[in-house]
Amino acid sequence: MECNDSRLFDTNNNLTLFVIEQLYRFRYLYSNVHPFLSFVLCVLGLAANAIHILVLTRPRMRQSSVHTVLVCIAISDMGTMTSYLMYISRFEFLSDKEGYSYFWALFLKCHAMLSIALHAITLYLVVLMAFIRLSAMKLTTSRWLDHTRALTSVILIALFVFIMCVPTLLAHQIDETTRGVTMHGIYYKYSVGFSTLMMKNGCFLMKANLWLTGIFLKAIPCLLLVCFTIALIHRLRENNEKRKILIKEERAKKRGDFTTYMLLLMVTVFLFTELPQGIMAILNALFTTQFHQMVYLNLADVLDLLSLINCYVAFLVYSFTSSRYRQTLFSVLPLTRVSYSGVSTRQGTLKCHANPSVKQLVQRVNSAEVTSVRSPLMEKKAAQATRSNTFQPADF
């Protein structure tokens, strides 16, 4: 790809050439591992997010609009991993140098757009989740706690992102690469490349699309994440100061603060993984020819890996930090199924239901404990009661 843009690297500098050479070497070495690593991450990620959706849709977990957004994030992540799993299977494990059928060429063209769109949707939904939590911390009766409002926001975000990704779909075209004849007839092979329209006038439309993608789908959500992270930290500090004054409300505020800390951890992880990608997207638009070929393509697999890792963030954070989530998770898994009741799992509301064997075992243990602590006087009274209750034939 040759575009009329400014130069970023001095190709006459030995240090620059050495760094670029190492990037190419890294790409060559990592490309041998990436397909297998990505395949495993996609398979495990699909299972993890399916379980995540199952847990968050339980009645005891549907009380929060944040959980509604988390379900939508999991669905988006599953779409990302499904598309990438199909891409890895066909274009890495079963690659064909001559080209592919028109169906697979069309899939590759759509995959280029879907991978960007679904990942951007996830990023904006994390921003929405942070906004909802911040609104709830300011006002406990915030309208953003309503599930319908949260779901409407998710739909609007998805529509906005897909509209922004239409130029990416148009930026690629399907080209015929091979034509041959077999005993079954004529066959055609196709590949996907950049559109000739996008490459005209010094890649004007291509650079415009890169700017559009870099700013609206990377830079802006990253900037919003930074703002909401700072706002959440500031709000937490204010709450801590209030708690020092109102000691009696500490227990009531503990759950809310705990939820905020979990969300803050998620936002921070997304920020550290997405901010470098946002910077690279801007540089890719500024220095398209050099940066795209020498840096972006050499690190493309690493960026894909970060995107796949982000698909695990919500499940891992909730699994390791939320006892309520873990208890609900154990209740829905077949091998660890235990029924729970009550609103709060922090106040000993664990119960066993509809399991006679468990009830009988508990009764036996309780009776054994009572028997073991009986005094001789208690045993004597029990024996007298048994004799008095012995069946006597009735007189007719």
Q: Which positions does each model-derived feature cover?
A:
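Intrinsically disordered regulatory tails of 7TM GPCRs
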Residues: 1-21, 179, 238-261, 323-396
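Helix-to-loop junction signature of class
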Residues: 38, 42, 79-98, 115, ...
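Extracellular N-terminal segment of 7TM GPCRs
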Residues: 1-47, 92, 396
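Class A (rhodopsin-like) GPCR signature focused on the TM5-ICL3 interface and adjacent 7TM helical core
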Residues: 44-47, 125-137, 168-179, 213-246, ...
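Seventh transmembrane helix
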Residues: 224-225, 266-273, 278-282, 299-355
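Loop architecture of class A 7-transmembrane GPCRs
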Residues: 9-24, 93-117, 150, 164-219, ...
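Intracellular effector-coupling site of seven-transmembrane GPCRs
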Residues: 75, 153, 160, 185-203, ...
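Extracellular TM2-ECL1-early TM3 structural module of rhodopsin-like
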Residues: 27-39, 66-129, 136-143
